[in-house]
Design a protein with these regions (language model features):
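N-terminal intrinsically disordered, cationic/polar leader segments
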Residues: 1-32, 37-42, 47-49, 53-63, ...
Length: 128
């Protein structure tokens, strides 16, 4: 029997892969921010609903996205700005670990503020 969820998952994965293949670095970073903030909302729901297995999966995804954002930094060319962004990504990673261990949404909220501000700044770079 055909599982429609498998088809949708394959479509969604192909769609993201196709967007990533045709995107420039600016768009790729924006996609990472979008994915991060979407997944952060899921973590909030998982903690509120006490779905701790799903929370762990979402935290793992968030950590991978932070790794991707950090890997996109050019610390040599970016200088102090890139170093500051790296520090913020690492701070968010630590906050996510605390949120996961303590099931404390205040860590999620502070991470959301930081990442939303970074996303807005990155979006502003694209309009210049």
């Amino acid at each position: 029997m055909l599982d429609l969820n498998d088809g949708f998952s394959a479509y969604k994965s192909t769609s993201v892969d196709a967007k990533a293949a045709s995107a420039d670095i600016h768009k790729l970073v924006l996609m990472l921010f979008d994915g991060f903030l979407d997944e952060l909302e899921k973590v909030t729901g998982h903690i509120k609903q006490k779905r701790y297995d799903k929370k762990a999966e979402s935290i793992e995804k968030l950590m991978r996205i932070l790794g991707g954002l950090e890997a996109s930094l050019d610390l040599e060319k970016g200088g102090e700005v890139a170093q500051n962004m790296q520090n913020l990504y690492q701070h968010c990673g630590q906050a996510l670990l605390q949120a996961s261990m303590k099931n404390d949404l205040s860590y999620i909220d502070s991470t959301r503020v930081v990442m939303t501000n970074l996303q807005e700044g990155w979006q502003g770079l694209g309009t210049q």
